[in-house]
């Protein structure tokens, strides 16, 4: 398989070189192989020979490298609710009669920008974070999810301050919050169909939660609708 690894910056002065990165490939039967690749600069491209057809790939599964991505993985065999603190996400499995492998990652850096002009003009995408949901799901797997947003959370790393705060220090109205989704990095962001915004108190205090009434594999982030 052909692989391309992109290095992005989070509070770092430059791209790093000679970084050992573990990359794990998994097939539909959950067979895994993990390799270490030394990465330098923004892009590292290579070809990896595998004895199976991979349907999932992820980096740094054992957290040996300290970076701006924190994730958790789990095997789901029944209906269950899991608070995934490292992923800043609550997973609610509502139906599972078989077994599913789930991995959720939280990226503490800016998502790729919106490419389409009319979407870019209408929405301000989060400059600070996004999520990735991946896995090998059974045919019976059905789940929802939840995560918290806060525009005034210094203790939590100010993850949504830039998105939610207006120049005068006040907050955007939470009615203008939307969730964006895309299946993978080759696709454009679009407004996700299955979410609700739940304010905690005032709609202009910059805190609340997002409920994802369905979850699908892909990347998720927040955006604010620009005023006309």
Model-derived features: positions:
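Exposed aromatic-hydrophobic patches
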Residues: 43-51, 144-151, 205-214
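Beta-strand-rich interaction surfaces with strong enrichment in secreted/lumenal proteins
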Residues: 34-37, 132-136, 211-212
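Proteolytic cleavage junctions
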Residues: 51-61, 67-81, 156, 169-228
């Amino acid at each position: 398989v052909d692989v391309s690894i992109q290095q992005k910056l989070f509070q770092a002065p430059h791209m790093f070189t000679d970084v050992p990165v573990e990359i794990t490939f998994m097939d539909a039967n959950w067979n895994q192989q993990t390799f270490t690749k030394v990465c330098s600069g923004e892009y590292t491209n290579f070809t990896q020979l595998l004895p199976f057809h991979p349907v999932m790939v992820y980096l740094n599964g054992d957290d040996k490298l300290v970076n701006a991505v924190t994730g958790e993985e789990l095997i789901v065999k029944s209906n269950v609710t899991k608070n995934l603190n490292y992923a800043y996400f609550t997973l609610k499995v509502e139906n599972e009669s078989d077994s599913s492998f789930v991995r959720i990652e939280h990226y503490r850096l800016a998502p790729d920008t919106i490419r389409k002009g009319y979407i870019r003009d209408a929405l301000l995408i989060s400059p600070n974070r996004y999520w990735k949901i991946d896995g090998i799901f059974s045919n019976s797997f059905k789940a929802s999810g939840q995560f918290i947003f806060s525009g005034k959370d210094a203790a939590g790393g100010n993850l949504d301050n830039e998105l939610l705060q207006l120049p005068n220090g006040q907050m955007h109205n939470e009615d203008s919050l939307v969730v964006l989704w895309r299946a993978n990095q080759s696709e454009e962001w679009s407004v996700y169909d299955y979410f609700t915004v739940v304010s905690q108190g005032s709609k202009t205090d910059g805190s609340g939660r997002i409920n994802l009434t369905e979850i699908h594999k892909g990347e998720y982030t927040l955006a604010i609708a620009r005023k006309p």
